[in-house]
A protein has these predicted regions:
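Charged, heptad-repeat coiled-coil alpha-helices that serve as long linker/dimerization "arms"
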Residues: 1-79
């Protein structure tokens, strides 16, 4: 009985963790899309400093996205 409860608790933890990671992935996808749209706006094309800042933000968001995606895939493989 204790073993079953422990297994159920572990499953619930993995589900919560997976849902949290999926939420973070979704937020990062939105952030990446938003930054890319900002970079394409005509009023921003000639503002090189702003574009550079956006480029740095985009690179960081993509890095975080890849890390979260890898974390999610590892979690799926071990479920």
């Amino acid at each position: 009985r204790r073993k079953k409860k422990a297994e159920e608790a572990a499953i619930r933890r993995r589900v919560r963790l997976r849902e949290g990671i999926e939420g973070e992935i979704s937020q990062l996808e939105y952030k990446i899309s938003h930054i890319e749209k900002q970079m394409c706006l005509p009023e921003n094309i000639s503002d090189y400093e702003y574009l550079e800042r956006l480029g740095e933000e985009l690179a960081e968001a993509k890095k975080q996205y890849e890390e979260k995606l890898e974390e999610w895939m590892n979690l799926e493989e071990n479920s």
